[in-house]
Design a protein with these regions (language model features):
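A conserved acidic, glycine/proline-rich C-terminal tail/linker
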Residues: 215-243
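A short pocket-lining beta-strand/turn micro-motif at the edge of beta-sheets
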Residues: 225, 230-233, 250-252, 260-262
Length: 267
């Protein structure tokens, strides 16, 4: 386990990498003894640093929700990160690609809470009861650490991603909000178009068998830290497509069927 000073030092390095748009070496290469607990401690330090600068916590994200992604990361559960106020982008926006380092798009559903949600023993039924509405969402993910180390060619590990706020960089909400019991959430599907070509398709059941399962998992995961999910918070439930890279000039349109669509362009 790393000490608090080291957690803070790493958090400042990640913060500088985000601001300068220059990736740093994977943390797991600099600190091979790092643990999952260390990685979340670094993430908390980084989020605290941003809040001290005036940012506001607006919710949370859940990542690594598919079995394939968990296996590739050598973990057996998802990860999570924080959503801050400056991460939210309007549907239909022109997004400066220079705001990010290596941006990618993921297709998700967002749960907007009406009631507090607290673990342990939180279930999918508690999530339904606490949710005000569910709305289509795109997550913009980024990497402040190298995916592959330029010197050793070693790939980054899950410790690096968790420390890096679970790779979160932006959120776009759009389409039509629905009440939790309005549709069978498992069967909500989406088509992701990049420049008019379908690049990814997916169905929401790909997220832990049901997209609300991730929200329950998060409430239970945060309970030991005496943290609950608060009314008004936005929870990204996890991606049901693979991430698609975004470059300058790319236009994205994601069609959620009768739940509407979300669009953006990178400039």
């Amino acid at each position: 386990m790393l000490d608090k000073h080291t957690h803070t030092l790493i958090a400042h390095r990640l913060h500088q990498a985000e601001q300068s748009r220059e990736q740093i070496r994977a943390i797991s290469l600099e600190y091979p003894e790092i643990t999952i607990e260390d990685a979340y401690a670094v993430q908390r330090e980084w989020v605290s640093l941003k809040i001290a600068e005036g940012r506001v916590l607006k919710g949370h994200k859940i990542g690594l929700t598919s079995k394939a992604m968990q296996a590739s990361s050598q973990i057996s559960e998802p990860d999570y990160g924080a959503l801050l106020d400056d991460m939210f982008i309007h549907d239909g926006s022109d997004i400066p690609v220079d705001r990010f380092i290596v941006p990618r798009i993921e297709v998700e559903l967002a749960f907007v809470l009406a009631k507090p949600l607290r673990g342990p023993n939180c279930t999918i039924f508690d999530v339904y009861n606490a949710t005000d509405y569910i709305i289509p969402a795109l997550e913009l993910i980024d990497a402040r650490c190298h995916n592959v180390d330029p010197e050793t060619q070693r790939p980054r590990k899950v410790f690096d991603t968790i420390s890096d706020n679970a790779a979160n960089a932006g959120v776009i909400l759009g389409g039509r909000p629905i009440k939790p019991d309005e549709l069978d959430l498992r069967w909500i599907s989406a088509l992701l178009y990049r420049n008019g070509v379908i690049e990814e398709t997916g169905v929401a059941a790909g997220v832990l068998n049901h997209p609300a399962n991730g929200v329950a998992w998060l409430a239970n995961k945060l309970a030991p830290y005496d943290v609950q999910l608060e009314p008004g918070q936005i929870i990204l439930g996890g991606s049901f497509t693979r991430p698609v890279a975004a470059s300058r000039g790319d236009t994205f349109h994601v069609d959620y069927g009768n739940m509407g669509s979300i669009s953006c362009r990178f400039v």
